[in-house]
Amino acid sequence: MKEVTRERMDAFCEYLINEEKSEATVSKYLHDVAVFAEWLGTRDLEKIVVVEYKACLCEKYASASVNAALSSLNCFFAFCGWYDQRV
């Protein structure tokens, strides 16, 4: 089952640090994933749900901000091996 857990986020943080991402980048990526996880709640993590999240972001933020958040999520999904969730 695809879930955004504390353990996965901790492992993702370690991965980003090992990839020599800046502290600001690590912080931003983790923030974006945490916001998504909160929005996701108990829903199943499926591509259609990620597309819905993108639509919600597009209603509130400029396209550059939306793209930055989606980049964070896509990196997290790739890290988890969830390539079919990326948008």
Go through each PLM region and give its residues.
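Onset of an N-terminal alpha helix
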Residues: K2-D10
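N-terminal core-binding DNA-recognition domain of tyrosine recombinases/integrases
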Residues: M9-V87
